[in-house]
Structures are given as C-alpha cells and as structure tokens.
Amino acid sequence: MSKPEDLGDANGDADRGDLSGDLRSVLVTSVLNLEPLDEDLYRGRHYWVPTSQRLFGGQIVGQALVAAAKSVSEDVHVHSLHCYFVRAGDPKVPVLYHVERTRTGASFSVRAVKAVQHGKAIFICQASFQQMQPSPLQHQFSMPTVPPPEELLDHEALIDQYLRDPNLHEKYRVGLNRIAAREVPIEIKLVNPPALNQLQTLEPKQMFWVRARGYIGEGDIKMHCCVAAYISDYAFLGTALLPHQSKYKVNFMVSLDHSMWFHAPFRADHWMLYECESPWAGGSRGLVHGRLWRRDGVLAVTCAQEGVIRSKPRVSESKL
C-alpha cells in the first residue's frame, strides 16, 4: 500500500458534516471489536446475521484482519490477505481467533489466523503486511464514469420506491420488507438499480457506492482496511447470479474463499465505488472480481471470491 498521508479524496463526504462526536461507527465499536483473551488470542461476540442465518463472511474476514493487525508494528500495513471458509459459522456462539506470527521481517510480515467454534476451524486466513515504501513503478486502471452518490437513491429510499409500485409482485414485496427491517452497518447506493416487476437477464456486472455508517476518522489506517474487508463481501457473490436470475432460482449460496489486495490508503467511512464483475460460473461455483475506488479515481482495493451456487429451474409464474 502506498504512502499514508492521504486517506482519501480531499473533499471527503460533505453530506455528513462533523461526525467526530458520539456517532462512532458501529463497525468499529461493536461489529469488528475483539476481546483479548491471551497473547494472539481474541474473541468476537457481536455478529450481523444475514437471511441465510449463517455468520456473515465479511465480518469474519474483518475480525480476522483486526486480530492479525494487533500482532504487527504500527509502521506496517496489510497489502494482501487470502482466506478460506471451511465450515459454516454458528451465530449463537462466539468466535475465537488464534494468530500465528509466521514471519516478521524488515519489510514484510506474515500472519496466519484461524477462526474457531466448537473446537473446530471455521475459517483460515493468511495476511501479509508491508512497511510503506516509495515506488517509481506505478500504474492502475481508470475508474468507471458513473453518477456521484449524491445523485443516487440510498438503499432505504430505493426500497421505498419499489414498495410504492402497485404492480410489484407480492413475493418481492415480502422480500423487500424483510430487507428494510434489517439493520446493516453500511450505506449503499446502486448505480443502475434493477427493475423488480419482472425478472431480467443482465450482464454479470454491477456497481454501487458504499461506505461505513458513522464516523471512523483519519488516524487508523489498519481499521479502515478491516472495515473494507467487511464491506467487500456484501452482495459480492450475487454478481454471478445476474445473467441467470430469469431462468434459475438459487437455493444455496455460500462463499468458499476471499482474497484482497490493498493498493492505496482510503477512508472506509467515505463513499467508495465498488465495481463488481463475474468472469465465469460453472461446476456449481461462481467467480467474482471487485475493485474499490476512491472518489478521486484512485484504485484502493482489489478483491476476488469464489463461492458455491446451487440452483434449480424456475417454475413459470403468473405476473400480478
């Protein structure tokens, strides 16, 4: 990851005003907060449970990175992590995080993290940290041109707009009300919201603006990376479903692995554009790639994930 002086675009997020008071992000104070039990041993307690009733993979990745970051010095920062989800997590039981200090070098340090429940590993992760270093060799892709977040509806307003449609199919109405009732610690604005009154066949690509709810601040680069790890798993694998949703209904979907590469400092409590695409699906699996862009056009994070996707053909339904 490049120099730490600039954690994001200079304009920041003006729509928030000054949140440095008592609106500390719940992702920092609760969701990613770990209790130290011993040296390199931590316990996580607070879990957001999606509709699958399993632990949210992004939270496990984020907490594992929090644990790993506690074992390295202040002058090194994560540049990559590679994770496997090996068992389903139990949201009713705390997760223990064991950190192994695999290597501590002058420029690079490697940490292995194992997340355990009921005496068995549910998740394993390798994270590599690097001391900040200048580099004359630099390049990146160009950020897509999209409307700014201020011109787009937030998730709550978009759902409300869908629900006001008198022609909305009842099953979508039920699902949207369920989504609206959930408390999610991130804010999302879709760049091209889908029409829900009919199933569409879309390209396996989507983009949305995303940021953590609440205030994190400028100082803790490591925490912003941990929050980005949480954010990166949200709606990510679903990108692989977009070309198939008109013909197939998914009855099982779960992440198998997750990788991230951190390129430049950023603030996870400022809007970032998440550009997601799925280059391949087959063998009951789907592959997705993602890029998190700062508002000033800097590529901050690259992500990749493969997951199990099991589906069955849709039965034709009458349209209401």
UniProtKB/Swiss-Prot annotation:
Which ranges belong to the motif Microbody targeting signal? Answer: 318-320
Reactions that this protein is recorded to catalyse? choloyl-CoA + H2O = cholate + CoA + H(+); chenodeoxycholoyl-CoA + H2O = chenodeoxycholate + CoA + H(+); acetyl-CoA + H2O = acetate + CoA + H(+); butanoyl-CoA + H2O = butanoate + CoA + H(+)
What EC class does the entry list?
A: hydrolase
Give the signal peptide, or none.
Answer: none
Q: Tell me the GO molecular function terms.
A: acetoacetyl-CoA hydrolase activity; acetyl-CoA hydrolase activity; carboxylic ester hydrolase activity; choloyl-CoA hydrolase activity; fatty acyl-CoA hydrolase activity; hydroxymethylglutaryl-CoA hydrolase activity; long-chain fatty acyl-CoA hydrolase activity; medium-chain fatty acyl-CoA hydrolase activity
Quote the cellular component terms of the Gene Ontology held in the record. peroxisomal matrix; peroxisome
For this protein, the parts annotated as crossing the membrane are none
Q: Where is the active site?
A: 233, 255, 305
Question: What InterPro entries does the entry give?
Answer: ACOT8-like_C, Acyl-CoA_hotdog, Acyl_CoA_thio, HotDog_dom_sf, TesB_ACOT8-like_N
Please list the GO biological process terms of this entry. Answer: acyl-CoA metabolic process; dicarboxylic acid catabolic process; fatty acid catabolic process; negative regulation of glycoprotein biosynthetic process; peroxisome fission
Q: Which Pfam families match?
A: 4HBT_3, 4HBT_3C
Keywords, A to Z, come to: Fatty acid metabolism, Hydrolase, Lipid metabolism, Peroxisome, Peroxisome biogenesis, Serine esterase
Give the principal location in a single coarse category. other
Activity modulation comment: Inhibited by CoASH (IC(50)=10-15 uM). Also inhibited by cysteine-reactive agents.
Name the CDD domains for this protein. Answer: Thioesterase_II_repeat1, Thioesterase_II_repeat2
Highest taxon of source: Eukaryota
Q: How does it assemble?
A: homodimer.
Q: What does this protein do?
A: Catalyzes the hydrolysis of acyl-CoAs into free fatty acids and coenzyme A (CoASH), regulating their respective intracellular levels. Displays no strong substrate specificity with respect to the carboxylic acid moiety of Acyl-CoAs. Hydrolyzes medium length (C2 to C20) straight-chain, saturated and unsaturated acyl-CoAS but is inactive towards substrates with longer aliphatic chains. Moreover, it catalyzes the hydrolysis of CoA esters of bile acids, such as choloyl-CoA and chenodeoxycholoyl-CoA and competes with bile acid CoA:amino acid N-acyltransferase (BAAT).
Check the record and name the NCBIfam families matching this protein.
tesB
Q: Which family does it belong to?
A: Belongs to the C/M/P thioester hydrolase family.
| Name this polypeptide is given | Acyl-coenzyme A thioesterase 8
Identify the species of origin: Rattus norvegicus (Rat)
Q: What is the lineage of its organism?
A: Eukaryota, Metazoa, Chordata, Craniata, Vertebrata
